[in-house]
């Protein structure tokens, strides 16, 4: 009886995990654009600014991806209006911390 209960619990957990993976794959296929942005292409990233950390030689640089990864599907579904589109275009940020020698090492 105890083994039967554990077996049922195992199958329920397995089914939930498989359903979660299936849902994530469906969302990725239907919403996310397959073409990745190219960080080496300067037209696709925009520098928002940089600042120096006080009492150190380190700087923080802020970048934004110009391309909205959800733009096509949002426009098709009529989800995004013009104001939301402007905000969504700046929704992905890249932060780079560097020092006088280049990119800072993790500690």
Curated annotation (Swiss-Prot):
It comes from the Bacteria. Residues 1-20 form the signal peptide. It holds the Pfam family DUF5502. Keywords: Signal. This is Uncharacterized protein Lmo0206. It comes from Listeria monocytogenes serovar 1/2a (strain ATCC BAA-679 / EGD-e).
